[in-house]
Amino acid sequence: MQWEVVIGLETHTQLTTKTKIFSGSPTRFGAAPNTQTSPVDLALPGALPVMNRSAVERAIQFGLAIGATIAPYSVFARKNYFYPDLPKGYQISQMDLPIVQGGRVSFAMEVDGKTEIRSVQLTRAHLEEDAGKSLHEDYHGMTGIDLNRAGTPLLEIVTEPDMRSAAEAVAYAKALHTLVTWIGICDGNMQEGSFRCDANVSVRPVGQKEYGTRCEIKNLNSFRFMEDAINYEVRRQIELIEDGGRVVQATRLYDPDKKETREMRSKENAHDYRYFPDPDLPPLVVSAEWITRVQAEMPELPGAMRERFTREYGLSDYDAAVLTQSKAMANYFELICSIAGHEQAKPAANLLMGDVASAVNRDGIELDAAPVSAAQLAVLLHRIADGTISNKIAKEVFGAMWEAKSDSPTIADELIESKGLKQISDSGALEKIVDDVLAANTKSVEEFRAGKEQAINALMGQAMKASKGKANPAQLTELLKKKLSA
């Protein structure tokens, strides 16, 4: 039997407000336990919540970014459940009338070697408060409660069950991560829990309209874990059904060490939480004027920039998609092009996606902290374009520039000169190299003249080796062909 996978994601994004959603307590990460709390966060009698305007504005920004409907009137509700790190005995959230309704997130993904633009429909995005934290490992035989996180503002973003593979779910999650960090509503730090996903996974026979029984995998805080967890859960459900069993609706956790999911508890439905409107908070009213003001302050979005990069710079869909995965990368690319010229767009993209990205990842730094400026890279690109150095030598020069950490705008020229890396373009010098190589490699010469055209590659390699990589490849190839055909 052929199976179809059905996936929906719920993503909790921690909003970048300085204070909590219903109190004036700070939201800084890493403070000593229970030092960032207030009577509201601790649920002391008589303490009343007050809505954080900045949290609402960030929700409006997100709604505008995905083309959603911003509800002019939305309501907060109490989600009732007991947990030690939830002092009120309920979480303030939104149920029937969320602030953001509908919308769509588009993203690029590789399918069979081709770049496809796909999109996922969103059901809603609603504001809510985070719970505190239970600390199980810090105390022997006891659990500590840290309420610093209680009341931190969250925007929970819920998709329709539109995704059909773990790879597609990860591509969507990465695009969402890019979007919320791009517009500045979330810092996207998955290790600190600022961006965490729950995946609802089910399977059904191909062609069946009804959905299968879903299981929710909670708190996936890395894209790799998300893909592994979904793939495992899909295999588990299919094997269970094919062995005559049935999938039971449940909440599950992913164990990255064992690479498997395990049941945490039976899966609740909305009625289990007994939602009802919170009497301490008035309805949230968002005026058209407020939306217009927020819209005027919105930056160019990743999707629009991706399309502009293909149109304005002639980049492929793939290159444009990679460059717009991060606002820092996109801005860096445009700055290089503004200095080096649009004709250097493709070489600039290759340099950023290759050597620069590799160096940033190797050193574990952010692109903003890169020791090589856009102006310095523009000079390097010009030296490749004017034939001063080859692409191969450019890699060596870039590595030296990265290590030098120099402020000099002409560091590329200085390194090329001091290391003697200028490309050999003198016809006399190249001719001597070619003559020596042909004389020393008579077998390859005979093979080429006998019709084995790839034999020229061996000769080219020997010639480049003889020149210590400094020969102009185009001139060298032309000269080799001319001599071999004589």
UniProtKB/Swiss-Prot annotation:
Cross-referenced Gene3D superfamilies: 1.10.10.410, GatB domain, N-terminal subdomain
Known catalytic reactions: L-glutamyl-tRNA(Gln) + L-glutamine + ATP + H2O = L-glutaminyl-tRNA(Gln) + L-glutamate + ADP + phosphate + H(+); L-aspartyl-tRNA(Asn) + L-glutamine + ATP + H2O = L-asparaginyl-tRNA(Asn) + L-glutamate + ADP + phosphate + 2 H(+)
Sample GO molecular function, one term: ATP binding
PROSITE patterns for this protein: GATB
Enzyme class, broadest EC rank: ligase
GO BP: any one term: glutaminyl-tRNAGln biosynthesis via transamidation
Enzyme Commission numbers on file: 6.3.5.-
Transmembrane parts of this sequence: none
Cross-referenced Pfam families: GatB_N (PF02934), GatB_Yqey (PF02637)
Superkingdom in the source lineage: Bacteria
Disulfide pattern: none
Keyword field: ATP-binding, Ligase, Nucleotide-binding, Protein biosynthesis
Protein role: Allows the formation of correctly charged Asn-tRNA(Asn) or Gln-tRNA(Gln) through the transamidation of misacylated Asp-tRNA(Asn) or Glu-tRNA(Gln) in organisms which lack either or both of asparaginyl-tRNA or glutaminyl-tRNA synthetases. The reaction takes place in the presence of glutamine and ATP through an activated phospho-Asp-tRNA(Asn) or phospho-Glu-tRNA(Gln).
Similarity remark: Belongs to the GatB/GatE family. GatB subfamily.
Quaternary structure (record): Heterotrimer of A, B and C subunits.
Name of the protein described by the UniProt record: Aspartyl/glutamyl-tRNA(Asn/Gln) amidotransferase subunit B
Organism, scientific name: Herminiimonas arsenicoxydans
